[in-house]
Curated annotation (Swiss-Prot):
Reported cofactor(s): Mg(2+)
Family matches, as PROSITE patterns: AMP_BINDING
Family statement drawn from the similarity comment of this UniProt entry: Belongs to the ATP-dependent AMP-binding enzyme family.
Family matches, as InterPro entries: AMP-binding_CS, AMP-dep_synth/lig_dom, ANL_N_sf
Organism annotation: Mus musculus (Mouse)
GO terms under cellular component: endoplasmic reticulum membrane; Golgi apparatus; lipid droplet; mitochondrial outer membrane; perinuclear region of cytoplasm; peroxisomal membrane
Main location: mitochondrion
Protein name as it appears in the record: Fatty acid CoA ligase Acsl3
Gene coding for it: Acsl3
Molecular function via GO: arachidonate-CoA ligase activity; ATP binding; long-chain fatty acid-CoA ligase activity; medium-chain fatty acid-CoA ligase activity; protein domain specific binding; protein kinase binding
Amino acid sequence: MNNHVSSTPSTMKLKQTINPILLYFIHFIISLYTILTYIPFYFLCESKQEKPNQIKAKPVSSKPDSAYRSINSVDGLASVLYPGCDTLDKVFMYAKNKFKNKRLLGTREILNEEDEIQPNGKIFKKVILGHYNWLSYEDVFIRALDFGNGLQMLGQKPKANIAIFCETRAEWMIAAQACFMYNFQLVTLYATLGGPAIVHGLNETEVTNIITSKELLQTKLKDIVSLVPRLRHIITVDGKPPTWSEFPKGVIVHTMAAVQALGVKANVEKKAHSKPLPSDIAVIMYTSGSTGIPKGVMISHSNIIASITGMARRIPRLGEEDVYIGYLPLAHVLELSAELVCLSHGCRIGYSSPQTLADQSSKIKKGSKGDTSVLKPTLMAAVPEIMDRIYKNVMNKVNEMSAFQRNLFILAYNYKMEQISKGCSTPLCDRFVFRNVRRLLGGNIRLLLCGGAPLSATTQRFMNICFCCPVGQGYGLTESTGAGTITEVWDYNTGRVGAPLVCCEIKLKNWEEGGYFNTDKPHPRGEILIGGQNVTMGYYKNEAKTKTDFFEDENGQRWLCTGDIGEFDPDGCLKIIDRKKDLVKLQAGEYVSLGKVEAALKNLPLIDNICAYANSYHSYVIGFVVPNQKELTELARTKGFKGTWEELCNSSEMENEVLKVLSEAAISASLEKFEIPLKIRLSPDPWTPETGLVTDAFKLKRKELKTHYQADIERMYGRK
């Protein structure tokens, strides 16, 4: 699937609906302004325009399967952020000594909490929040040291697993730093996981201790604790919950403060602790798989340090003046890596949540301030779904403007798009037109980092223009510790994920079945392989899957086979153009196994054949269906629809009726809500080997089916 499509400025311009005479006058003013500012900015603009076309990565040899490296690491890959700091505890010690009394972790105080009754009768919790309260580097270090000591007192052993199942907050990072210091292997689980997945992760890793929050203990863990027989200690980061009678014997609940108090006592007794080695496991990060059972990725200290080294080198002027807003799940490699990059460079990290991020967020009481308005971050990571939501909300506001205001916005938008393509800035547009949009994220954002799924060219360009900052689109996997590529801040091209980071190299492997070869012209194509110190140790207790996805070359370098298909542009930047596997990550981050969806539905009497399709730019699954002629004709008769076979298949009413049947079957088959096709296309023609849509063995040819139904895909997903 073509996840990344390069778009020129002309194809993304907004349409104007303004009186032609007034339009000519405004264009005259803009032209006059451009001429007057052209000469002073000429040399600066020219250099900026040339910069995006510079070579950013190149192959290390002339062979077709040669790896590409950043031009800054052709002679050797980077693996250490600071000399001598080869484990995460040493990195934090270095940062603590350098930025000792500087603010590090910030949390907003809850001033008031209210229940607000909605028109439909539902009750929403609304909060009024105060200012950020900050912990310094020294504060965090002492709390982590005491907490680690306290965990030792509870029986936690070095190189033994300990789980964290908690929302993104300062206590999460403090607990993680404690584990890194004391060489406890931190098992991370998403706070959104369902009961069976949580039980699987806890039992597979044989944890005896788990760190969580009061809310998650009451809403998620309470019902499954009895299914985790080795569990002995539960540590809540925000106070002790009420006891319940069904709580299993032998399991003790502690508060984080109480465990830290134990640690203070241990400090007085000078109890020594084990130090990690670079090769030791730092994190076992659970990630979704095609079967729905999460897999634990083993990530060493050296993996994480190499990854954050590569990421940090792609962020210019990173330092003490920067403020990062943390709200994505810390159990996700993108957020954990981003926060560790900030922590190691003296940046402040202020915590938030998707429900309190902006003034208009769902939990913020009307009239009070969201987190971005108070924190005013300079750096922010986001997944495409959040950026798409911002794009849609702003454009809805634009459409509600008066005709004059709307057209002024559109003129400024299109003008800035043209200037960006030339490498020029637009200070007047930024100041007078886009200032209010920029304030949605606090007004100080200088870099947005996007990862987790592909970002559409339209949304990327919108964020560039309206928030007056670059969008660094990255590509990486949990298995590569999140590191792979990130676009340069001065590269405003869309549809690409940038050049390899200095910590890794990337090569393309032929995929004959898909028709992708590293000898393809005009650009090499193939399966993306990532090599470097950031490539992880493999899957926990899953040697077979590890051997499938990882290998070591003759030089001892570890490589990851991603299953994604890429293409290198002449300047060394990577595009993601297809996916080898039928596992697709939706825009919100859920993984959908297309084969699983098809298997659940293809045996229905109404269905002769089905192909599920999902695109990472969107949040739902669609499908192409060859209906059984007899069953569909009968369904049409019972619903009162008439017409020829082709007319029935092309009828939107019949599509909806078939969709109802599919949805019921999907629920019966226990498919998740996000796995159920939301829209379908009925095909009047069967898929045979002669059509080229299936193999001789009648296996689906996904690439050909996508091409065949491209117009229907665009219809079902709609255009931006």
